[in-house]
């Protein structure tokens, strides 16, 4: 397993983009601090972990109602602070936040968008003003251990039935 240490001020996306394209498990350990950037993880078997959700935060600020240079709205599915589009990935001991507010002006603002089988979210905090977590299609093996989903309750997820 490959272990990579990242500190505040370093670009997490640059580290992810430089990962080997093999199938070896990788853990990216984030030192305590704030990582202000939009992240896309498309490499399988990759874990992003912090020391605790209280001290390690990944944050960005895209809202669905934002007008892009082409004159169109951003839309919900392009607002995620962290996109995980790979299988067997994990997120541990991290806060992922979409800081776009207020809801009435920005619309939906995903913190975490997961499209991959076997995703594990452990001891994390997810924050946004609306639609904090989005999984699509519903993965058959979604794992949420001791994770906070958002400011309101939600219905249980049933793969292939929603």
Residue ranges and their predicted role:
Residues 12, 21, 30, 73, ...:
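Generic, low-specificity signal for short hydrophobic/alpha-helical stretches with a mild N-terminal bias
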Residues 35-36, 59, 113, 134:
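Generic, ordered loop/turn and secondary-structure boundary motif
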Residues 7-17, 23-47, 52-58:
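N-terminal extracellular ligand-recognition/capping segment immediately after the signal peptide
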